[in-house]
Amino acid sequence: TRVVTCDNGENVQFLICDSGVIFIERALYGRTDGTTCKEGRPANQLTNTQCSQTGTLEVLSHRCNGKQVCEVNTEVFRTSDPCVGIYKYLETTYTCLPATRSITCEGSDAPLECDEGTIQIHSANYGRRDQLVCSFNRPANQLANTNCLSQSITTSKSAERCNRKSQCDVPASNSLYGDPCVGTYKYLDVAYTCG
């Protein structure tokens, strides 16, 4: 699936999988042609067609991989400007992996299992990307930080523990992953397939 979002400051890119989970294949923030998102723009804002922000794929992958729905404001890519004066857009290509998603609140164990084949972890995050998940009886200040990510270390440690096994328990705890955001109540979000 290919999605293009013009960067006007309030625009949000919305990715969704009806079944399975998001896997970002390609992502570009910038401009590579003179026709995309040109509506109402002067010609001088469309001239640079070799403009791309480095790190776009990594940022989107961190935010969206393993989720069923993902919203990203184009503002997150404005940390630096790859081509000043050029009107940019976010172009994303993603696929939906037929994965099982397991969510476990901090302090519990995530039981991953395959009836057939063995576990292959595609993405895992220990932290918080949402205010509603694992929020029961928790004070608001423990739920406020929704940009608490530790995806690369969580994915590698979970994969180390579970890949190629038919079942595996992973603790949602600081002892395994460290504490990516002190004071925030976290959860472990794992997307895996059986193969």
Swiss-Prot record:
Pfam family, one: SUEL_Lectin
Gene3D superfamilies the UniProt entry points to: 2.60.120.740
Keywords annotated in UniProt: Hemagglutinin, Lectin, Repeat
Chain ranges of the SUEL-type lectin domain: 1-97, 104-195
Record field: temperature dependence: Loses half of its hemagglutinating activity after heating at 50 degrees Celsius for 120 minutes. Activity is abolished by heating at 80 degrees Celsius for 60 minutes.
InterPro entries: Lectin_gal-bd_dom, Lectin_gal-bd_sf
GO cellular component, one term: cortical granule
Purpose of the protein: L-rhamnose binding lectin. Has hemagglutinating activity towards rabbit erythrocytes and human type B erythrocytes. Hemagglutinating activity is inhibited by smooth-type lipopolysaccharide (LPS) from S.flexneri 1A and E.coli K12, but not by rough-type LPS from S.flexneri, E.coli K12 and E.coli EH100. Agglutinates E.coli K12 and B.subtilis.
PANTHER family associated with the record: PROTEIN EVA-1
Protein name: L-rhamnose-binding lectin CSL2
